[in-house]
Regions:
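Short beta-strand micro-motifs within the conserved protein kinase catalytic domain, predominantly
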Residues: 87-101
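Protein kinase glycine-rich loop
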Residues: 30-36, 41
C-alpha cells in the first residue's frame, strides 16, 4: 500500500481508515475491546458491508520506533487462513516513518482462556486436563506459523480466544517476526 494523507480521516469522534482499498471506521469515544502494551483494540466496521472488525491502534511510542513499526506492518500483512488464527485484513498508516499505525483484523468473539479458567475451571478436578485439551488447537496454529517461518512473540492465556462456537483461536501475534 502506498501511504497518502487520505488513508486516515477523522470526522468528529470517528476515525476512518482505508485498508487495501476498503474503508473501515471506529468511534474513539467507545470503550475499547482490549488494551495491551503494544496497542488498544477497538470495535470497528466496514463502511461497505457493515461487517464488524477489530481495529488495533499501535501505541504511538512504539509506532515511532522503526523496527517495531516494521514488525507491526509485517504482522498485519500476514494474510494467512487457518481456523485457529485470527484473519488479518491489513494495516493503515499516515506515513511510512512515524505517526499512527492501525492493524485491522476479523473480529473474534468469545472469552479468553484466562477468563475461561477463572470463570469455568477454577476448583474443578479436571481443570488441568481441560486446559491441556484447549491447547491442541493453539499448537496446531503455532505449527502452521512456524512452517511459514513466523514466530509468535506473545503467547499467553489472554491471547487465546475461545469463540462462542467453541473454536479456539490464537490472537495478537505480539508483533511477529520471520
Amino acid at each position: 500500500m502506498k501511504p497518502n494523507y487520505r488513508n486516515i480521516v477523522q470526522k468528529g469522534d470517528e476515525i476512518y481508515l482505508c485498508v487495501n482499498g476498503e474503508w473501515f471506521f471506529y468511534n474513539q469515544t467507545e470503550p475499547p475491546l482490549g488494551a495491551g502494551a503494544m496497542g488498544t483494540v477497538y470495535l470497528g466496521r466496514s463502511c461497505q458491508t457493515q461487517e464488524r472488525v477489530a481495529i488495533k491502534r499501535v501505541v504511538d511510542k512504539y509506532a515511532n520506533v522503526p523496527s517495531i513499526r516494521e514488525r507491526a506492518k509485517l504482522e498485519a500483512s500476514l494474510l494467512f487462513r487457518h481456523r485457529n488464527l485470527v484473519e488479518m485484513i491489513g494495516y493503515c498508516e499516515l506515513n511510512p516513518y512515524n505517526g499512527p499505525i492501525f492493524i485491522v483484523s476479523r473480529l473474534v468473539q468469545g472469552i479468553t482462556l484466562d477468563e475461561h479458567v477463572n470463570t469455568h475451571l477454577r476448583n474443578r478436578k479436571d481443570a488441568v486436563k481441560r486446559i491441556c485439551e484447549s491447547l491442541y488447537p493453539v499448537m496446531d496454529a503455532l505449527d502452521y506459523l512456524h512452517q511459514k517461518g513466523i514466530v509468535h512473540m506473545d503467547i499467553k492465556p489472554a491471547n487465546i480466544m475461545i469463540e462462542h462456537g467453541s473454536n479456539i483461536r490464537l490472537m495478537d501475534l505480539g508483533i511477529a517476526y520471520t
